[in-house]
Amino acid sequence: MKLILTQEVAGLGGPGDVVEVRDGYGRNYLLPKRLAMPASPGAVKQVALIKRAREVREIRDLDQARALRDQLEALPVTLPARAGSGGRLFGSVTPDDIAAAVHAAGGPKLDKRRIEISGPIKTIGSHQVTVRLHPEVSATVSVEVVPAS
């Protein structure tokens, strides 16, 4: 089944991409959640026009993403979390927690889906987190997890 994505879908692509998926995945997941629309010839032409306009904006976005990367990498992010003896956290730090900590530290609001954690953060200390700002630009943010008082 050919579909046009209306939102970013992990493993498939971004908005405007024409993708070929299995019928069940498209019919039961992508279409009901409005993540995609059927790929008719008229819709494909319209998407091509939108993509051309997006390419012009993307050059500008790439410069903004690079500036944002520099800002994020220089930002000291401290995240207070409840911890027991030995420095182990009760639970773990989620991408949503990191996005809130970056915003509280004076950074921009980040989409939690763009934050990639290599493994669960369950200890106090400094941890490296990757933030995908643009398909070509990623920022590595140092998050200092401290015990909450």
Swiss-Prot record:
UniProt keyword annotations, A-Z: Ribonucleoprotein, Ribosomal protein, RNA-binding, rRNA-binding
Classification via InterPro entries: Ribosomal_bL9, Ribosomal_bL9/RNase_H1_N, Ribosomal_bL9_bac/chp, Ribosomal_bL9_C, Ribosomal_bL9_C_sf, Ribosomal_bL9_N, Ribosomal_bL9_N_sf
GO biological processes: translation
One Gene Ontology MF term: structural constituent of ribosome
KW Glycosyltransferase (keyword) present: no
Cellular component terms (Gene Ontology): ribonucleoprotein complex; ribosome
Family to which this protein belongs: Belongs to the bacterial ribosomal protein bL9 family.
PANTHER family according to UniProt: 50S RIBOSOMAL PROTEIN L9
Protein name per Swiss-Prot or TrEMBL: Large ribosomal subunit protein bL9
Source organism (scientific name): Acidothermus cellulolyticus (strain ATCC 43068 / DSM 8971 / 11B)
Gene: rplI
